[in-house]
């Protein structure tokens, strides 16, 4: 799937009980090579009752998955714009990929912009397996205090991604039991820029910075 625009659709996915890995919208690049030009905009994604436990698969409003055991795979040109996301559990906009740098083939030209995220208890925007992603002009607020005591989460953060720019965002009211910062440059991420953002009323404060996980460097 490439050269596609998903525009102006309202999605909900609420079952009787919570279901691990439940999503509103999933984009999958797996053993598919390079997919180009995917736009997700003007959507309302709400009421996705996934698992509240990350290790169980969690749940997301928008999930971008990139894996390639046989063929290196990625998305080149992904825009997530002007969406309203609320009451999606565990997460809002979530990328997943391999963290193995021996097979590094990152998503490129990723823009996450002008999204409103409300009443999401876990991670707001997670950039994983990308190079040069821009996350800007997003508002994340009113994170409900419903995560289990074991769960860590934060507002906007890259994981195993390089040269991420996080700017002109507002994150407020994060209430996770662990972390709960507005912003984070997480594990195995190089060249992250966090600038001109607003953070307030988050249990963990403004920002968290992690190293490569195996050293103090």
PLM segments and residue spans:
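Extracellular beta-strand/beta-solenoid scaffold signature
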Residues: 18-31, 53-72, 87-104, 119-127, ...
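Right-handed parallel beta-helix
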Residues: 2-13, 34-49, 72-91, 105-123, ...
